[in-house]
């Protein structure tokens, strides 16, 4: 009798083992997006076409919330170039960019366009870049903006991180570096004049922060 039931018993064991293996493979295949690099999850977000209804959006936003809090920025956000009127992975960086993931307390709508500025394209082309001047966030608060590229696991720039950083104390002494001030020097693309040391330090600081956190979001 033992010989009679030997092979069915072995077969049963094999079936159990194969079933467990199959379940394991399925788990690995489906995976959890939170285990992936933020940049690769961003690719999936854009490709989904679901905007902020995408199932992983809230988790992705939480990581930008962390960037905002840790850096001391007043605002942290993601911009993408546009194609066919919506944010894209391969849009034209010489035209307007659109906001996507937004860490603001009162976020802009998905896809709201930001009028093109040279620092957007510079960041998209792979170099951290800053605005050429500060601006008024409010009457009491001035900010300087910086942008840096975010790379996916295939080494593609898939978006740019933007941060707005408070600089009121510095700009109070150099109002000509505030584009919203009557004494603004007018620099929008190339800076041809001398940059005061304090202003240069501010520029370097915000650029370094944008680059640091963009690298944390990247898959590189």
Where are these regions (language model features)?
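C-terminal motif of bacterial Sec signal peptides marking the signal peptidase cleavage site
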Residues: 19-22
């Amino acid at each position: 009798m033992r010989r009679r039931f030997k092979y069915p018993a072995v077969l049963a064991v094999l079936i159990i083992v194969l079933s467990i293996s199959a379940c394991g493979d399925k788990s690995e295949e489906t995976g959890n997006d939170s285990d992936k690099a933020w940049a690769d999850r961003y690719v999936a977000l854009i490709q989904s076409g679901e905007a902020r209804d995408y199932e992983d959006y809230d988790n992705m936003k939480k990581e930008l919330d962390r960037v905002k809090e840790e850096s001391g920025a007043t605002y942290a956000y993601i911009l993408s170039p546009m194609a066919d009127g919506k944010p894209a992975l391969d849009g034209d960086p010489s035209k307007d960019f659109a906001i996507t993931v937004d860490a603001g307390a009162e976020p802009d709508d998905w896809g709201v366009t930001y009028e093109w500025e040279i620092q957007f394209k510079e960041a998209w082309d792979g170099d951290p870049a800053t605005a050429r001047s500060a601006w008024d966030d409010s009457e009491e608060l001035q900010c300087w903006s910086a942008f840096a590229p975010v790379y996916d696991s295939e080494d593609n720039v898939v978006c740019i991180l933007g941060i707005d950083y408070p600089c009121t104390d510095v700009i109070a002494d150099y109002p000509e570096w505030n584009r919203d001030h009557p004494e603004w020097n007018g620099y929008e693309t190339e800076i041809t004049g001398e940059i005061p040391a304090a202003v240069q330090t501010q520029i370097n600081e915000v650029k370094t922060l944008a680059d640091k956190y963009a690298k944390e979001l990247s898959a590189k």
